[in-house]
């Protein structure tokens, strides 16, 4: 268990990272509209690692100007957090963010018994947004753990259309030049896939290799 001073430092670091991400140019995806921020159910975005789950949730919250607190449990400094520590996490979040009605829990499935905390938050009328990327967030488990108090939103890597939007490739033009650019983009898409981070890094082979290994290990 971390003492509250260390916990505050970690969560403050994460808040700082969140501020940096607010300045990024992002692609608004159709799944964003599926996140019902007015619902009393937990909104659970599920997908493979690096498919853009966190970004999708950030965009939904920022778009409507909701005041929220954020925790990324996929942080090595929080590796030993237990379910009984989550109230301390909540206390520190109130200290950092002030009052809030939306709680964004990134990869909370890493914590055994996480659903007990989430259920308590829902009973307190807290709006909860969750992301997850492994077998611990299977539909059957969610139905059991959250007793119907959740809405699942599946998310996949970019479609070719979304890939084109991010790469500023014309998806409608029919001139020889436009079609040639579109075919070239499709060739790249087939080779590297639609993981969002691949659009901003130069070398993709090691990224994909490491990502596949990471997904299989999880």
Question: Model-derived features: where do they sit?
Answer:
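Walker A/P-loop
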Residues: 54
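Walker A (P-loop) phosphate-binding loop of P-loop NTPases
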Residues: 49-50
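Hydrophobic anchor at the beta1->P-loop junction of P-loop NTPases
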Residues: 45
């Amino acid at each position: 268990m971390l003492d509250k001073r260390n916990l505050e430092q970690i969560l403050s670091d994460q808040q700082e990272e969140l501020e940096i991400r607010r300045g990024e140019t992002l692609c608004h995806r159709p799944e964003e509209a599926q996140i019902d921020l007015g619902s009393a159910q937990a909104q659970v975005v599920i997908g493979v690692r690096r498919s853009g789950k966190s970004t999708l949730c950030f965009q939904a919250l920022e778009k409507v100007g909701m005041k929220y607190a954020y925790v990324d449990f996929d942080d090595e400094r929080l590796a030993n957090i237990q379910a009984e520590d989550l109230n301390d996490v909540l206390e520190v979040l109130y200290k950092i963010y002030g009052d809030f009605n939306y709680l964004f829990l990134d990869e909370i499935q890493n914590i055994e018994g996480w659903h007990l905390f989430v259920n308590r938050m829902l009973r307190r009328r807290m709006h909860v947004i969750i992301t997850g990327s492994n077998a611990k967030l299977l539909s059957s488990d969610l139905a059991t753990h959250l007793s119907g108090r959740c809405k699942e939103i599946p998310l996949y890597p970019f479609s070719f259309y979304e890939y084109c939007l991010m790469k500023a490739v014309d998806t409608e033009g029919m001139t020889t030049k436009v079609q040639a650019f579109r075919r070239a983009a499709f060739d790249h898409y087939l080779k590297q896939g639609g993981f969002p981070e691949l659009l901003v890094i130069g070398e993709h082979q090691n990224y994909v290799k490491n990502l596949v290994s990471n997904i299989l290990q999880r």
